[in-house]
Curated annotation (Swiss-Prot):
It is found in: Virion; Host nucleus; Host extracellular space. Belongs to the HIV-1 VPR protein family. This is Protein Vpr. One of its GO terms (biological process) is monoatomic ion transmembrane transport. HIV-1 lineages are divided in three main groups, M (for Major), O (for Outlier), and N (for New, or Non-M, Non-O). The vast majority of strains found worldwide belong to the group M. Group O seems to be endemic to and largely confined to Cameroon and neighboring countries in West Central Africa, where these viruses represent a small minority of HIV-1 strains. The group N is represented by a limited number of isolates from Cameroonian persons. The group M is further subdivided in 9 clades or subtypes (A to D, F to H, J and K). Homooligomer, may form homodimer. Interacts with p6-gag region of the Pr55 Gag precursor protein through a (Leu-X-X)4 motif near the C-terminus of the P6gag protein. Interacts with host UNG. May interact with host RAD23A/HHR23A. Interacts with host VPRBP/DCAF1, leading to hijack the CUL4A-RBX1-DDB1-DCAF1/VPRBP complex, mediating ubiquitination of host proteins such as TERT and ZGPAT and arrest of the cell cycle in G2 phase.
Length: 96
């Protein structure tokens, strides 16, 4: 029977350490784009729902990623990423 080869590669960074670093990066980015009271309320919601658990950390990471993605996608004023509305003439004509 075939077996997967043993992992002899370089040691990876521990998952929890990587997760906390990712959360810190997301929080720093979120503070630049969203009002602090919103983020504070989100943190309170996550804490009341999950308590002080890794499941809560994963949930807030997922939510912050989704919020930032949508924020950039619909057009953040701080970024070049996103949809930029095109100005058009009457009846969609783009040339004069």
């Amino acid at each position: 029977m075939e077996q997967a080869p043993e992992d002899h590669g370089p040691q990876r960074e521990p998952y929890h350490e990587w997760t906390l670093e990712l959360l810190e990066e997301l929080k720093n980015e979120a503070v630049r784009h969203f009002p602090r009271p919103w983020l504070h309320s989100l943190g309170q919601y996550i804490y009341s729902t999950y308590g002080d658990t890794w499941e809560g950390v994963e949930a807030i990471i997922r939510i912050l990623q989704q919020l930032l993605f949508i924020h950039f996608r619909i057009g953040c004023h701080h970024s070049r990423i996103g949809i930029i509305p095109q100005r058009r003439g009457r009846n969609g004509a783009s040339r004069s």
